[in-house]
Swiss-Prot record:
Organism expressing this protein natively: Homo sapiens
Protein name as catalogued: Homeobox protein Nkx-6.3
PANTHER family: HOMEOBOX PROTEIN NKX, HOMEOBOX PROTEIN NKX-6.3
GO biological process, one term: positive regulation of transcription by RNA polymerase II
Record lineage: Eukaryota, Metazoa, Chordata, Craniata, Vertebrata
Recorded superkingdom: Eukaryota
């Protein structure tokens, strides 16, 4: 009785009868067959023209098997024809498709190391040392300065001997609070200056006049020779100040070379 009322409602409902295109085309064939099989013989022709949306019709519909022909009409989905509806996401065939990003090899190095651009100066970054910067650092070496006491002791030692052996150089450096390399370099520079001075004064190397001609000429000696003789004498504690004054006046040029300035005498 309920089915008859539903069929009568569907036939008498004019708004639904005016829109036959609202029928579902996918399930039309299977639903119509179910109507012919399950409905009574008298209601089959009547319900065929309507839209089967009754409760009994919906519950009596068979489970539609997956139809591969529905997807075959679309060329971009045809490649998935062999996959079932239940195993689309878990089928082992899915593993055959290349994953996104496989065509891009992974970088083992840092991308910044390949670019090597300095964002401030735009210069190429490299690990090679800069020869210009190395030369600047090497030129920053300053010349050591010595005190008056150290210069006096060095000059006194140089007048006695122009060359120092290893033990003598070490002893002198220790007594003056200097390093052996400083003493060695100072003696090298002092010998160079001494050779230049000797080359510019050839008269000092000429022999003196003998005997009678030079007897009365003893007082005609140059002041520098008198100072040298006075300088070569042993030091006397009572006259050290005078000898230091003569030494500083004689070697005034040495102070200007060492950037110490000349002492007032």
């Amino acid at each position: 009785m309920e089915s008859n009322l539903q069929g009568t409602f569907l036939l008498n409902n004019t708004p639904l009868a005016q829109f036959p295109e609202m029928k579902a085309p996918v399930c039309q064939y299977s639903v119509q067959n179910s109507f012919y099989k399950l409905s009574p013989p008298g209601l089959g022709p009547q319900l065929a023209a309507g839209t089967p949306h009754g409760i009994t019709d919906i519950l009596s519909r068979p489970v539609a098997a997956p139809n591969n022909s529905l997807l075959s009409g679309y060329p971009h989905v045809a490649g998935f024809g062999g996959l079932s509806s239940q195993g689309v996401y878990y089928s082992p065939q899915v593993g055959n498709f290349s994953k996104a990003g496989n065509e891009y090899p992974t970088r083992t190095r840092n991308c910044w190391a390949d670019t090597g651009q300095d964002w401030r100066g735009g210069r190429q970054c490299s690990n090679t040392p800069d020869p210009l910067s190395d030369s600047i650092h090497k030129k920053k070496h300053t010349r050591p300065t010595f005190t008056g006491h150290q210069i006096f002791a060095l000059e006194k030692t140089f007048e006695q001997t122009k060359y120092l052996a290893g033990p003598e150089r070490a002893r002198l450096a220790y007594s003056l609070g200097m390093t052996e390399s400083q003493v060695k370099v100072w003696f090298q520079n002092r010998r160079t200056k001494w050779r230049k001075k000797s080359a510019l004064e050839p008269s000092s190397s000429t022999p003196r006049a003998p005997g009678g001609a030079g007897a009365g000429a003893g007082g005609d000696r140059a002041p520098s020779e008198n100072e040298d003789d006075e300088y070569n004498k042993p030091l006397d504690p009572d006259s050290d100040d005078e000898k230091i004054r003569l030494l500083l006046r004689k070697h005034r040029a040495a102070f200007s070379v060492l950037s110490l300035g000349a002492h007032s005498v």
